[in-house]
Amino acid sequence: MKTSDFNYELPEELIANYPLEKRNSSRLLVHLDEIEHKSFKDVLDYFEEGDLLVVNNTSVIPARIYGHKESGGSVEVMLERVLENNKALVQIRSGRAPRIGAVIIFDTFKLKCIDRQDNFFIVQFDRPPLEVFNEIGHVPLPPYIKRPDEDLDKDRYATVYEDRELQDSVAAPTAGLHFDDDLLNAIKKIGVKMARVNLSVGAGTFQPVKVENIEEHDIHSEYLEVSADVVDMVNATKEAGKKVFAV
């Protein structure tokens, strides 16, 4: 299978740089017996009593920070995941990749590059990395959104059902961004149950596929946790002949 098999034209003017005022006003493409174009709030029409809605309760870290090299060159650091002993696995974007041992300078602290793993660096902080990212980090908007992050993104680049204590993802589970509290309450009133899993979205989600043969692509891994209770709910729903909606 070739990556070129999936090429298509996507006009830039069709890429929204800002969310709509109401989450559930986004467009919805439905493909069942035929293709239908709907508003996302119409997803309510496809639920029935006894169905199950499974969502990802991950929450997004303000995972992008900006500093500079000792030589003065600008550096962008994007968190992949926090490691032990105040270390973190990160992506680093700069004019030239830093060497092992290089120091990156920020307003109130420095970090040191101590190792490299493929496209990622292991860096050493002088305090817990999450403290740093929560203090000076920016919302990690995806690269196809051509604007800096703003205050509104702290709310809108997150789901309404996230577990904010988790702080485990560096990108939002975007399929869930279109649900608001009103829509979720309407779904529950039908008699639909809701289950939560935890999938931590990593920075690798922004990595392009650089090979022509898809089988040669080394895809990144992500942490996923599904409780026994959720497994039981999914199995029971299927055995009852009802639908499972995985978001």
What is the role of each PLM region?
Residues 1-247:
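Surface-exposed, charge/polar-rich loops and edge strands
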